[in-house]
């Protein structure tokens, strides 16, 4: 975890500050416990997102079931609803971050929504495996105790009849 924190700190405190681009943005997750360590020292446009806090981008509502997420998001004061086949609260958080990035790049809300609806997720991260048996099968390459705990909590929250872990 320390290497992850140090890599993020380097990204925000070094690379972003030394970028020659005029429109530089730091997009930070207020739900991360160490977020204040990543706030750039020099003035850079800094935007925040959160699953629950009133920030630049946050969830107004989230309905999660085995078929995916139905989200109502507020991004820079604009509210929109979107449905995605991805599951897991971490995906809702990633969608907020991506939506904020889209806003900074002046991408239309409609285009952002259509992009989210077409997302299939990252291979190996609660990836749905299609089959003709009507069984919900997911693959996740969680290899740390915390990652495995998060995957199991997500799947248990969806109330499957039976959960088999291989």
Give the residues covered by each predicted segment.
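Loop/helix-junction capping segments adjacent to catalytic residues or to phosphate/diphosphate-binding pockets
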Residues: 92, 145-146
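Short, glycine/acidic-enriched loop or turn micro-motifs at the edges of active sites
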Residues: 32, 143-144
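Active-site beta-alpha connecting loops in nucleotide-dependent enzymes
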Residues: 122-124, 146-166
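Switch II (G3) loop of P-loop NTPases
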Residues: 137-143
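Acidic, Mg2+-coordinating active-site environments of NTP-dependent enzymes
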Residues: 1-137, 160-161
